[in-house]
Amino acid sequence: VNQSAQGTDKVPSIINCHLATGRIGKPGMGPFSLTGQPNAMGGREVGGLANQLAAHMAFSPAEIDRVARFWNAPKIVRREGLKAVQMFDAIERGKIKALWVMGTNPAVSLPRARAVRDSLSKLDLFVISDNVISNDTIDAGAQILLPACAWGEKDGTVTNSERRISRQRPFLKAPGE
């Protein structure tokens, strides 16, 4: 719901429907915003966002130490990286020269989609790993397109927005294997 060109309109509409029908503040009721990326919660839990560590921890010295000890990783990032919108602003300003996009379509899913597409043309190196051969981001000028497995070709777990973890087993062989 929220990662679309109309996301900023959809979410308040959902909230307003809940308010109008009295479905807020009662057990089992309330709005539940859906992300635009499968396993987005799983990515957050393992530290897949640039602005937080694993398990939704911030970058305080104590939290950095906790993650480093848990993972037995003496060298760990010590500060936030750029969020997606900030990253594309940095590309526009020439601060980022190379980008590797994996399994997402930021030329559609991010705010200011036209600015995102325009910034991609300023990269010296633009690599995409995806399971499709064409989408708006690829068509914006990817120089290298690498294959990636689709969800039915992967083995692992996914975590949905309510934090339910599901086992995922492949039911198709990846092309070329």
Where are these regions (language model features)?
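Non-catalytic alpha/beta scaffold blocks inside enzyme catalytic domains
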Residues: 1-27, 32-177
